[in-house]
């Protein structure tokens, strides 16, 4: 999957890497549970157990911290999807394994939907950085699915169309599961994906 350079480059900070990572983890938990705009930097400072000076040395502004959180979520998503796909035996099963990952994720008590959609909903209209990161994350996933689809459908155009359909199922399942508080949308999406894959291979 494409590990594009989205987000904030933490290598430019003078604060220790472990401290930055801890701040990001605390911010991620708070942002994801309650929303970005409802959580202030002072609350993050308290949660991380660092001084306000150190917090701002690590992340000069909240937008940079949000970018770092989203970059971490992108990496987590990539790892989870790739791990599930790697365990599958056939090209068809590799496509369907994405939905197995979603079902496991949806079953987690902390699941609150797609962090990128959530962030875009809050800040996409006012933060070009957040909008770009969210867009690049979705484009990266689309490209990854297209690569998997090409193993099932040799025709490039047909593979890209199948990938667009399967990615849309995954995106819709995330939103539906978050609202319903239920992992069943992953199962429904997997069944629909199987139907689409089988239809594409018969064409």
Language-model segments: residues:
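N-terminal intrinsically disordered/low-complexity leader segments
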Residues: 1-18, 201-203
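Helix-turn-helix
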Residues: 11, 22, 26, 30-64, ...
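Conserved acidic functional residues
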Residues: 15, 28, 118, 171
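Hydrophobic alpha-helical connector segments
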Residues: 68, 82-110, 163
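Amphipathic alpha-helical packing segments from all-alpha helical-bundle domains
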Residues: 75-78, 93-96, 128-151, 191
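Amphipathic C-terminal alpha-helical segment
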Residues: 105, 167-184, 196-203
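Amphipathic alpha-helical segments used for helix-helix packing
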Residues: 108-129
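All-alpha amphipathic helical-bundle segments outside canonical DNA-binding/catalytic cores
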Residues: 132-133, 150-167, 184, 188
């Amino acid at each position: 999957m494409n590990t594009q350079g989205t987000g904030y480059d933490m290598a430019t900070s003078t604060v220790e890497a472990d401290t930055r990572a801890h701040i990001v983890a605390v911010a991620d938990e708070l942002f994801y549970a309650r929303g970005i705009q409802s959580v202030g930097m002072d609350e993050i400072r308290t949660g991380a157990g660092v001084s306000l000076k150190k917090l701002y040395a690590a992340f000069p502004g909240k937008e940079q911290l949000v970018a770092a959180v989203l970059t971490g979520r992108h990496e987590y998503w990539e790892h989870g999807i790739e791990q599930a796909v790697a365990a599958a035996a056939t090209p068809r099963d590799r496509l369907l394994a994405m939905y197995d990952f979603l079902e496991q994720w949806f079953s987690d008590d902390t699941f609150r939907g797609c962090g990128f959609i959530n962030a875009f909903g809050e800040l996409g209209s006012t933060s070009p950085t957040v909008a770009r990161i969210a867009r690049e994350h979705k484009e990266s996933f689309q490209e990854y699915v297209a690569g998997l689809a090409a193993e099932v459908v040799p025709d490039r155009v047909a593979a890209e169309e199948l990938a667009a359909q399967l990615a849309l199922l995954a995106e819709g399942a995330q939103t539906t599961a978050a609202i319903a508080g239920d992992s069943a949308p992953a199962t429904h999406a997997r069944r629909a994906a199987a139907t689409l894959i089988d239809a594409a291979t018969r064409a």
